[in-house]
Amino acid sequence: MTRRDRTVALAAMALLVVIVGAMVALPPPADTTAAPATPVPTPAPRIFRDGVVGSISTLDPLFARTRPELDIDALVFSGLTRLGPDGTVVPDLASSWSASSDGRTWTFRLRPGAAWQDGIPVTAQDVVFTVQATQAADYRGPLAGAWQGVTAQAVDRLDVRFTLATPVADFPLAARSPILPAHLLADVPGANLGGTSFELAPVGAGPYRLVRLDATGAVLERMSDAAPSPAAPSVGPDPLLWQLPDDIQQIDVRVYPDDAALAAAFQAGQVDAAGGLSPDLTNQLSALPGARLVRYPRTVLTAVMLNLRFGHNVFQNVHVRRALLLAIDRNAIVRQQMGGLGVRADTLVPPSSWAFNAQAAGSVAYDRAAAAKELVAAGWRRSGSGWVRPGVKAPVTLELLTVDATTNPLDYAVAVQVAADWKAIGIPVRFTVLGADQAVNDKLVPGNYDAAVVDLNVGLDADLYPLLASAQAPVGGSNLSGFQSVTLDRLLEAARAYAPQSTRARRMAAVEADLAKELPILPLAYADYAYVVRNTVQGPTPRLISDPGDRYWDVLTWRLATAAGQ
């Protein structure tokens, strides 16, 4: 029996004693005619108000991109699987799954009774429709890569079979992608999917349904059959110190135009939580009475991408790459640019990941003198206050690409710090500042850059194959650095192959050891997703997340309470 169970039991026993005592002490009533029953008012729903910066133009997962859109969809829609505690993946719309011995074929069985929010049962055909919709030739939305290289087949009403072009071990994680209702969308031509009423009146199979949407945000109501995973964490704080809390029956996602407006709303008591704010505002709000900070480690790495394509010779010598990393004060980046809300990165694998191996990753300390020695080892020589590369007369000046401060203030600030650190060892930097789309399409994809400060989402499984495989190095591929290594290719392929996690952990350690030797990308830091919540909100539990919407992984265990005596 839990502590809360004991509290409830003791309260019930005390109430029973009072009732029995009253029955013994009171004389029999003179009139046995029953008095009219007094109607019991329906209690007001417990409402959790979550503040988010951004706007809402669509809630169709095929096209949702803004932070409010993605957060709402995380509550309205479900995938076959969902995140569990301690890095696990647990069933959601699926009740179970199995894989062939080579990991090429996966069969998922849908949960009997799973239904859309309009009451129609969820079937295997819904899954097949979703996969095919994201693979349509004319689809260019955010889920375009969700089911890439996957063929889906409905075996029967509840069973769906996936065949993978390339077997991978993390397929259950990929199966978290939201499933769409075929009975509402299958007859809509692909070109028209982005213009239906479904965009603003979605029907999902998630734990909350949309009941109202306007310019101020969305109102979501908990489905009556929504239940947390058996593996979900228990709620706190100690119920002896709090009144018995209630489930969150309604979530109001309130949207604000900028960080300042959201921070003001939190200070005014208009929202119960605020996430994704600047480090300064986050630290200010979390210091308010009755507020606390919940930090979710993320899979998004802030790094320096170096152009290692053939014909671009500046960084081909590994001593140069090591010198550039030695020169960067990554601890200062975490302290200053991230406001302490992050961790230094020593490898491309998040420190909170099951795949992280500190011994294999090693650690490159901030050391300007050692950086200069590495440049000398690469054949560079001093020229006044700068450096000259072998075979080149002019001193080295590096281009550093970054997005503008409005688009990504953190990356811009980090780029300024990196430039200052490199200048301190005699390497001046020329900034190229662009919007996000232009930086990617005009610079990173065609390889028209020297170095770039970028955010890389390595994913919950830390599959680094798309990021570094030689097969992805040609222009248009996902290996934007252009780094190619037969040795690393072999290690990456082995690490992503279907195998027990203990085997994969050893293989990932080999990958990290090779990355520490080659340094194809310079890891800087992982920023946390910082979530400021009021102490009346019980339950948000940190775990490694890929997207801020993943913070709702345990939302069905969250509670609202008021301090005892209030």
Predicted feature residues:
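Detector for C-terminal structural segments
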Residues: 15-28, 302, 327-359, 367, ...
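Alpha-helical secondary-structure segments
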Residues: 49, 123-130, 161-163, 206-207, ...
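Surface-exposed binding/hinge segments that line
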Residues: 109, 142-188, 207-212
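Extracellular/periplasmic solute-recognition and catalytic clefts
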Residues: 134, 211-221, 252-312, 335, ...
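Gly/Pro-rich hinge or "lid" segments in bacterial periplasmic/extracellular proteins
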Residues: 176-252, 260, 368-373, 560-566
